[in-house]
Amino acid sequence: MRVSNMFFQTLREVPAEAEIASHQLMLRAGLMRKLASGIYSFLPLGYRVFRKIEQIVREEMDRAGAQELIMSALLPAESYQASGRWEVFGAEMFRLKDRNGRDFCLGPTHEEIFTETVKSVTRSYRSLPLILYQIQTKYRDERRPRFGVMRSREFVMKDAYSFDRDEAGLDISYKKMYDAYCRIFDRLGLDYIIVDADTGAMGGSDSQEFMVKSAVGESRIAYCEACGYAANDEKAECVPEKCCDDKECCGELGLEKVATPDVRTIEELMQFFGCSAKEFAKTLIYKADDKVVAAMVRGDRELNETKLQNLLGCIELEMADAETVEKVTGAAVGFAGPIGLDIDIVVDLEVAEMKNFVVGANETGFHYKNVNINRDFKPKYVKDIRTIKEGDACPKCGAPVKVEFGIEVGHIFKLGTKYSEALDCIYLDETGKERPMIMGCYGIGINRSMAAVIEQNNDENGIIWPISIAPYHVIVIPVNTTDSVQMELAEKIYTQLGEMGIEVLLDDRDERPGVKFKDADLIGIPIRITVGKRAGEGIVEYKLRREKDFAAIPYEEAIAKAKKEVAEGLKK
């Protein structure tokens, strides 16, 4: 491709709305264009990368024995109503009615549709196991789209679904997809970690995420270097710190009510009482669907809303507003406590280990000290509802865990019979008995994977694409397009590389060399061959994007090196 014929435009300035490297570079390099909040169009250069990621995914899915199809993105409400997820998705689902008033949605995910399709075709155990997949656009009305295609309202996913006779069969299908995902992300050149995860609205039992460590990731990963345990913070188990073993120290003291005027926050309480945050228990008031509940964690801990939501089984969970807090507790925000509270109370495991702690008194300007669980109040649930943090004990081996941010690029689930039972997707076993199919679900975000690659492969000059998904492998840059000797050699190199099957650009624009070099670096072409003043000698400059130095070598050697580099890059 000649650059003079390409439909693209690079930007020198960083767009104001772009906060992270991948978003900035995808806009600056002319890979995509914003249409609206969370909605983007891919331009030719970006779409070439996009298609290559799709192709790698497709090749590995086919290699694992999965069969590709394509489902509609416009889906009838009845399918989601049958599984109960029409309500579960809440405001995140794009809903619409046709001219006859029938409810539809733009598909946020396709479990129900795949299940119904298999149900209509497959009836015998002889047809199982079965793995189907599609690469299709999804729609979710994100509350706050951000970071470009990292969290958008329209995105492309590869979603696959396995159907098996039993749990043993599901284990085999799950392992096939697990291995396929490892090969996919290896070929994309990603440095990733596999973590245990929450199943969320998808339902089911076991779940794992493929995470790319990144400071701009929206997920937090807890992992143990000692034993290999890894989970996202929604799933990571928290080991409660025990109260001290000194029975005299931990004996129950008498409950005291203390005046604490204008003392609301943990920091203010620490100063007032002269003790650490570990001696306080926060009482947080939440709205869980149509109920109000209280949740308690230690003063130095953060509540994990996903764990709380899963425990309560609610669709919507949000912090109560000040009016609700005052109505339920009889006090202003900052003075809520469990004693005398006439709502369900959920206590974190760590709070259950505490003795003689401080809580709000449900009276503005007052707190209780020497509070003890069961004596002074009785919780409905005692469960792990806090968020793990750096240095906490690993739930498997007890060593300190590390916590980092990550980008989720893939997610695999064991769904079991959640959808097959709800949608009556059954098969006849060897004895003629009806049994529900055992399902698995496997997703990869194509857009997000593209952004994740950029997050891990960039520098101050632009993107550094792995050869496997680069829009073009090589760019040939003649320094002076009016010099016939330079242009003749550049054309020769361009032609020979193209005949070898190498994807090559020829920057034949009448631009300054500096502009061409900056564009090549910004776009991230892996190999640059510059044809300059020594063209008459057959000498060119050969440079890899990931390296700073270049080599002045004969053009034949440059062609051979490019061929070898591309072959090795595509082999990985």
Swiss-Prot record:
Chief site of localization: cytoplasm
UniProt cross-references to Gene3D superfamilies, sorted A to Z: Anticodon-binding domain (3.40.50.800), Bira Bifunctional Protein, Domain 2 (3.30.930.10), YbaK/aminoacyl-tRNA synthetase-associated domain (3.90.960.10)
Top-rank taxon, per record: Bacteria
InterPro entries: aa-tRNA-synt_IIb, aa-tRNA-synth_II, aa-tRNA-synth_II/BPL/LPL, Anticodon-bd, Anticodon-bd_dom_sf, Pro-tRNA-ligase_IIa, Pro-tRNA-synth_IIa_bac-type, Pro-tRNA-Synthase_IIa_type1
Segments passing through the bilayer: none
GO MF annotation: an example: aminoacyl-tRNA deacylase activity
Self-association and partners: Homodimer.
Function description: Catalyzes the attachment of proline to tRNA(Pro) in a two-step reaction: proline is first activated by ATP to form Pro-AMP and then transferred to the acceptor end of tRNA(Pro). As ProRS can inadvertently accommodate and process non-cognate amino acids such as alanine and cysteine, to avoid such errors it has two additional distinct editing activities against alanine. One activity is designated as 'pretransfer' editing and involves the tRNA(Pro)-independent hydrolysis of activated Ala-AMP.
Protein name: Proline--tRNA ligase
Lineage of the species this protein comes from: Bacteria, Bacillati, Bacillota, Clostridia, Eubacteriales
Encoding gene per record: proS
